[in-house]
Structure formats: structure tokens, C-alpha cells
A protein has these predicted regions:
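Short, small-residue-biased leader/transition segments that mark boundaries at the very start
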Residues: 2-3
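An acidic- and aromatic-residue-enriched active-site/binding cleft used to recognize and process polar
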Residues: 9, 22, 33-35, 73-75
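Conserved catalytic cores of phosphodiester-cleaving nucleases, focusing on short active-site segments
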Residues: 17-19, 26-36, 54
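Domain-level recognition of nuclease-like catalytic cores that cleave nucleotide substrates
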Residues: 59, 63-89
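Nucleic acid-processing catalytic cores of prokaryotic defense/repair systems
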Residues: 10, 46-53, 74, 83, ...
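C-terminal amphipathic alpha-helical interaction region
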Residues: 6-11, 17-23
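Switch/connector loops and helix/strand junctions flanking conserved nucleotide-binding motifs
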Residues: 27, 38-42, 78-84
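Mg2+/Mn2+-dependent nuclease catalytic core
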Residues: 35-57
Length: 89
């Protein structure tokens, strides 16, 4: 089973999406940004920084997740860009 939470309080703010796969002890943090086409790369980087700075993985860690992956996603119209970061745990 996968557990999903949206706009949930975690760390020092509210992250867009948290996913937990308890049997594998895997957690996923997703932060999304809307950006102009020429700023999509930067928006992905900003999303990953926000995940770290606001400690959005804190709730996943307290729930026992050991492997945490962060996704910074930027959207512009029908296009999106994704950057992946691994949480140091």
C-alpha cells in the first residue's frame, strides 16, 4: 500500500505531497512550482531547496521511513521538468 497526503504540515511548513510505502520504508516528498518556460530548471532547484530548508521529510522520518526521495517539479502549460534529490538520513 502507498499512503498519500496533500498539503500536509511537515517540518517547518506545508509540503505539496508526501507519499509513504511502509513495507519498503520508502518516503517521497514532492514540491511543485509553476514557472515560465525559461525558468523551469531554476524552479525545480528552488523546490528542492524548499524541501530541505523547511525539513519536509521530518514527518516521513518520524513515521519510520528510511529511504527518502525528494522531487522538485516545475510546470509551464503542458510541459514539466523534474529534478530528483535524495534525503540524507
Amino acid at each position: 500500500d502507498v499512503y498519500k497526503r496533500q498539503n500536509i504540515e511537515s517540518g517547518e511548513g506545508y509540503c505539496d505531497i508526501l507519499l509513504e510505502v511502509p513495507e519498503n520504508r520508502v518516503g517521497v516528498v514532492i514540491e511543485m512550482k509553476y514557472a515560465q518556460e525559461d525558468r523551469m530548471e531554476a524552479a525545480c532547484t528552488e523546490a528542492l531547496k524548499q524541501i530541505e530548508q523547511r525539513q519536509y521529510a521530518a514527518r516521513l522520518k518520524s513515521d519510520g521511513m528510511k529511504n527518502i526521495v525528494n522531487y522538485g517539479i516545475a510546470c509551464y502549460r503542458k510541459h514539466c521538468k523534474v529534478k530528483i534529490g535524495k534525503e540524507n538520513s
